[in-house]
Amino acid sequence: MVFISLTSAYIFRRGLPTFQGETNSYVRDWGSVDLPWVLLGINTLILLVSSLTMELARRKAARQAALAPLSSIPGISLGDEKHFPWLGITVVLGFAFLVGQGLAWGELHNRGFFLSTNPSSSFAFLLTIAHAVHLTGGMIALLCAGSASLLHKPIEARRIAVDITAWYWHFMAVLWIYIFALLGFAR
């Protein structure tokens, strides 16, 4: 709901002029924001790769949960499966995305765009900061899902934690693509 509201406000505000008291007239104050597209593109790629690693972690957890009952049967050995730390890689990529966002905000500041420069820069910051806050929540969920294994939680509880976190993480990736497109096409 937050992002739908922000999108509606972004599109609505884009078309509205502002009353200027000095001239007693309405002026169009929606300025163009020179976004660091290459850096934002790299961030998008990082987030998409993290969505892939999250999906691999989800599938690994589902497979472990499906095979867990077999391991209790005498004489059945599942062997030593290779355990690749997909959740850990997703966390690292999530941090890389957030660092990239910080660099993008710094680049905007270097180009003279701040939260209060004009309405379009305010919305650009607001949308990306809101996404970063939500992604940080996803990072906390990732760390909780990863710690479930360290805390020896039941396999089904771990699978559910990873599954729910994966759905949220994929939503964050799709939401970022939406924000990226909104900032690019609705300037």
Regions inferred by a protein language model and the residue ranges of each:
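...captures the hydrophobic TM-helix bundle architecture rather than a specific catalytic motif
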Residues: 1-187
